[in-house]
Amino acid sequence: MGEAVGIVELFGLVAAFAAADAGCKAANVTLEDFDKNKPANADALPVPLIVAIKFRGSVSDVTAAVDAAVRRANEVSGVITSYIIPRPEADTEKMLKISGMDTSR
């Protein structure tokens, strides 16, 4: 078990970059990953790409980063959900390392 992980799932790559920037500027966190997904109903969505960004750091820093990222993403295109895992278990850590942008799988 290590540092906290915060995940923000949102609409669009531009919003993801804006949210990641805001989160990293708001707190002492590391931006771990961008996961992207084009859902089957993409044509019906306002923005046809869903992106999840992951922050890692202390619980208080991750909370501040996620809050800032959510505010910024809502200004751009919208947030689907966000969640903070204070101390991920070892098995959860394995799943957190899986990335939709990992082409080695």
Q: Can you annotate each of these PLM segments?
A:
Residues 1-50, 56-105:
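Long, contiguous binding/interaction regions
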